[in-house]
Amino acid sequence: TRHLIDMVWHRQMKKIKEAFKKMDYETALEGEREALEWITNHKGQFGHFIGGKFTKPKNLFKTINPFNRKEIAKISQGTLTDIKNSVDAARSGLKKWQALSPFQRSRYLYAIARYIQKESRTISVLESIENGKSIRESRDIDIPLAARHFYYHAGWAQLLDEEFENYSPVGICGQIIPWNFPLLMLAWKVAPAIAAGNSVILKPAEQTSLTALYFAEICKRIGLPAGVVNVVTGDGVTGSHMVNQKEISKIAFTGSTEVGKEIKKITAGSGKKLTLELGGKSPFIVFDDADLDSAVE
């Protein structure tokens, strides 16, 4: 028996040494099947999510896999009419949402968090094929963190009456997010907004809209009151339409400094509350004497 154990150990060590020499990567355990099936179920085309329903896809543009440059799906370009419809839906949803107690609202946030955990493998693959980041980053960091944000703010929602006495919700929040952390950035913005009793209109980056649309479907599955969360896809023109809506009480924007300056000019004197997170970068400095394999990891 001891001899057999030694043989197995030496074989494994030989494999490990060979692996370090080659530095090849095995295929990730996560496959694309479930994510692609979800896209296929929508016939490869997506409308906006307004008032608890997906609209008919129109004014379509392609979303591309940055790894192989192949088309993943077609997304709708949001128009001024779409934004106005989402404002109407958010206004209606706001009344229903604020009629609930903070504790009742927290139960929806907990449900969202649990659903993200349940669907984390599919969401991770969807984010990786659309954003281009490694599956390890989306699976082990971004998506679990997104779920944790909803858990965290669900807890705060339960304590609103005790810890935030005399505070009141802002109202309708317009939120614009970039492509680098699609679902995590969504969680950063949506979770605290709805926990505090607001309704939301979210515009994801045009390059990475699929996880936001998947999130919208989660909201529908858990029975979140219609209009509390709305997702309108499109480019900067769509975002501009949103910023100019008088009924939107707060704009939260993450993106370039140039666009942030324009938003500040547009909203100046309007009474809108404004949160700007501008010009963020994720630099990685590698010198010529670095271990390149470790740097890639």
Model-identified regions with their sequence ranges:
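Periplasmic-binding protein-like
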Residues: A191, K250-T254
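Conserved small-residue-rich beta-alpha loop and adjacent elements
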Residues: G155-A226
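A structured beta-alpha segment of the ubiquitous adenosine-cofactor-binding alpha/beta core
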Residues: N230-S249
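Short beta->alpha connector loops at strand-helix junctions that form conserved
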Residues: N198, K203-A205, T233, T254, ...
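Terminal low-complexity tails and localization/encapsulation signals of metabolic enzymes
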Residues: T1-K74, R107, A111, P144, ...
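ALDH superfamily catalytic-core signature
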Residues: E258-E297
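Residue-level signal for inorganic ion chemistry
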Residues: G52, R69-K70, R105, E127, ...
